[in-house]
Amino acid sequence: MNFEQARFNMVEQQLRPGKVLNPDVLEVLFVVKREEFVPPAHRRLAFADTQIPLGEADGARMFSPRVEAHALQALAMKKHENVLEIGTGSGYMAALLGAHADHVRSIEIDPQLADMARANLARAGVTNVVVEVGNGLAGSPAYAPYDAVMVSGAVPAVPQVLLDQLKPGGRLFAIEGAAPVMEAVLYTRVDQDFRRLSVFETVVDSLRDAAPAPAFVF
């Protein structure tokens, strides 16, 4: 399989028509090799518009390329920023975040997936991502505040404890709701308040242990 041609087709046939137009986002999708983070059994589907299974680990699946790209575009990260990811999975989103940011701390609840992600990141030469095992829905307050937080899985509502770990001007991307009605949202911290913007509708797998939690109240 010609992965470079498949990567080009993904960008030109899926992402640009879907209004992913930020040149920095499109560039990093060519630099970070998605196929290297996909389990070998599913590598031929690396650029398909689908959620790819990550083996037998609790049924976890990767976001589709379209959701990944829109999330990066919404966060609009800068090179100096400190980023937190909740739900490492294969490590691919962490690698994308790391290509845009100064440092990424990614928390994965499944030790098997955390090991997979560390191996994938090391093989890809990513050195500014740290993967920890734990329940990321509480965030990582010891290393807060963060310029950006990426929640790589659906939650019923974003826990306030995650929002509180944002810097002023910090952004948090998440997918809220329950199938079949989910909404990708971007929160921005403005002093002690939080602005919520609806980005798009989608359906993705929920984070493990993502039980209903206290959420941001307008």
Q: What do these predicted regions represent?
A:
Residues L72, A76-R195:
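Conserved nucleotide-cofactor-binding alpha/beta core module
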Residues M1-L84, Y92-A95, H100, L113-T127, ...:
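Class I SAM-dependent transferase core
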